[in-house]
Curated annotation (Swiss-Prot):
Domain of life: Bacteria
GO-annotated molecular function: rRNA binding; structural constituent of ribosome; tRNA binding
Subunit details: Part of the 50S ribosomal subunit.
Upper lineage: Bacteria, Pseudomonadati, Pseudomonadota, Gammaproteobacteria, Oceanospirillales
Keywords annotated in UniProt: Ribonucleoprotein, Ribosomal protein, RNA-binding, rRNA-binding, tRNA-binding
Protein name: Large ribosomal subunit protein uL16
Length: 137
């Protein structure tokens, strides 16, 4: 599963997820992309589940790029522990997703197959997504 090798701080504040994606919002590597239209958090497990689904669907052909990385630690206190006594240990890692963010990219497959694979992957993700193709400038 994806997570940072090392971080400056072990735990972070909750923060707020606002605004639109200013970076990582175009198809940069492949021909087709899965773009977020909603806002939310995607865990490392969800990123991996969607990747495995796409890989199974396209079989040997094509290449997949993961354009997001879970770099925010989410903490959780153990069950039946009283309030206070500090922040709990890190439970899992998430990527904060803003509308417009490119989640995955793919090339080397037909548009029909890419669309199918992204539809299957989107079912594993907690944010609304859309299929996009590369626009040549």
């Amino acid at each position: 599963m994806l997570q940072p090798k090392r971080t400056k701080f072990r735990k972070v504040h909750k923060g707020r997820n606002t605004g639109l994606a200013q970076r990582g919002n175009k198809v940069s590597f492949g021909e087709f992309g899965l773009k977020a239209t909603g806002r939310g958090r995607i865990t490392a497990r969800q990123i991996e589940a969607a990747r495995r689904t796409m890989t199974r669907r396209i079989k040997r052909g094509g290449k997949i790029w993961i354009r997001i990385f879970p770099d925010k630690p989410i903490t959780k206190k153990p069950l039946e522990v009283r309030m206070g006594k500090g922040k709990g240990p890190v439970e899992y890692w998430v990527a904060e997703i803003e509308p417009g963010r490119m989640l995955y990219e793919m090339e080397g497959v037909s548009e029909e197959l890419a669309r199918e694979a992204f539809t299957l992957a989107a079912a594993k993700l907690p944010v609304a997504t859309t299929f996009v193709t590369r626009t040549v400038m």
